[in-house]
Amino acid sequence: MESFENLSIRDSFTSGMEHVDEELGGLSDLSISKQGPTLSPQLINRFMPHFPSSPSPLRNTLDFSAAKADEEEDDRMEIDEVDDTSFEEEYNNEPIETHTEATENAVVEEIEATPEERQKQEKNESQDQSVEEVENIVSPHRSTVIKALLSPTDLGVAAATKVEGVVPLPPSANQDDNESSNNNAEGEDIIRNEEVEDEIKSSLGNHKSSQYANAFDSEIIKRELRSRSKYQPIQVSFNTHNYFYSDKDGIKTYSLTKPNHNKIDEFYDQNEAFKLPKPWSPNSHPASRASYALMSYLQLFLNAITTVVIFSFILSFIIALQKDLKSTWEQRKHELQYESRICQEQYLTNRCNQTPGLPALGEQCAIWKQCMDRNNDIFFRARSTLSAKLFGDIINSFIDPLNWKTLFVIFCGVITWCFSSNFLLGFVRAKSYYGNGIKTYPLPSSPKSPTSEETHSSMTASGEDSHLLKQ
C-alpha cells in the first residue's frame, strides 16, 4: 500500500513513450484535404485500374496527380435539396404548392412575350409530323430505286403511287411474344403520357394547356425525370452495334452495308412494287378498266412504233454500208485487172517476149511481166485495210454535212422521247389503276383473341391523341 501511495499521475517513468505522444499529435493534425505525396497518373492507372486518375468529364475535380497546395476542400457531404411535392401528389392530380405554379406562370409570361419562339416551335412540330408520316410509309432501298430509275415506266409508277403497309416478316416462334411485349411497352408509354397531360391540365387549366402544351415540353421532361429519379436511377447508355454476316455455308463475311431487318428489298422484288399488271392478265383489277387498257395499249403501240423506226434506221444504215463495201471491192478488183491488162499490152508491144530483146528495156520488161502474171484474187482477199478505210470515209462523209451538234441534238431528242413518253404513260397508268394513288399490302391475318384486339385498338387511339414526351 505504501508503494501505491507514492504513485502519482505525473510519474517520472516515461521511457519509450515519447514517440507515442508525437504520433498522437500527428494524428490530431490530419484531415481529409491534407496533401500527400503526389503520384503519377501512370502509377495510379497501373495499380488502381478500378479508380482511374480522370474517371469522366463530369468528375474532373478528382485529379490526384495535380493537386494544388492552396486548395482545401470541405469534408462535409453535399446533399441535394428534396422537392416538397411527393410522387403521390403529382400523379394523383392533387393541387401542387404555389412555388411550382409561380415558376410555370413565369414561363408562360416569357412565352407570351416572345412570339418568334412560337413560330419556331410550330415549324418544328410540322417538320416532326411530316417526318413521322414519311417513316410510316415503307420505303425501298437504294438498289431498288436505282433499278426503277433504269426503267422510265417504273419511275412513273413510283411517282404516281406510294406503297403503304408493314412488310410481312417471315413467321417465327417468338412473334407472339414480341407483339405482346411491344403492346405492353406502348401501353405503359401511353398511360404515362396521359398522366403527365392530366397533370398539366390540372395545374394550368384546360384553355392554357391547349394553348401552351407544346411550349412546356422541356418543363414536362424535367418534372418527369425528377419524379422518376425518386424511385429509379436515370441512366444514359451508348450502344455500338457491330453487324457480322454469314452466307449459306457459314463463312463469315463482313459487309459495310446496313442490315435490312425488315427485308424491304426482298418484299419489293417479290411483290413487284413498281410493276403494273398487263391489261389482259387475270390478276389485273384496275380502278378504271377502260382508261387503264387504253393507256396500256397506247404505250405498247408507241413503243412498238419507236422500236420499228430505230431498228429500220439501223438496218438501212447497215445495208447501205454493205453495198458500199461491195461496190468498193468490185471497183478495186477491176482496177487490179485493168493494171494487169495494161502490163500485158506493154510487154507485147515492146517485144519483150522475143529472145533477142532490147537491152535497154530489160528491167522494164521484167516489171511488166511480174504485173501481167500476178494473181489478182490473192490481192483482193486482203480486204481488212480496205474495209477500215472505207468505213472511216463513210462516217466522215456522214458527219461532215450534219456536224456534231446536229447529231447530238438528234440523239438527245430520241432519248428524251423514249424516256418522257414511257414516264408519262406509266404515271397515267398507275393513276388509272390505283385511283387514289396508294398501293397497300395487307398483312396475313393471325389468330388473336377479341380482348387483345380491343386493347390494341384502344392503345393506338389513345396514342394518336397523346403527343407528349416524344422520346
From Swiss-Prot:
One cellular-component annotation, GO: endoplasmic reticulum
Transmembrane segments: 300-320, 408-428
Bias kind Acidic residues: ranges: 70-92
Positions of the UniProt region annotated as Disordered: 66-135, 167-192, 444-471
GO BP annotations listed: lipid homeostasis; mRNA transport; nuclear envelope organization; protein transport
Function: Involved in mRNA and protein export from nucleus.
Note: Present with 1280 molecules/cell in log phase SD medium.
Protein's UniProt name: Nucleus export protein BRL1
Native source organism of the sequence: Saccharomyces cerevisiae (strain ATCC 204508 / S288c) (Baker's yeast)
Taxonomic classification: Eukaryota, Fungi, Dikarya, Ascomycota, Saccharomycotina
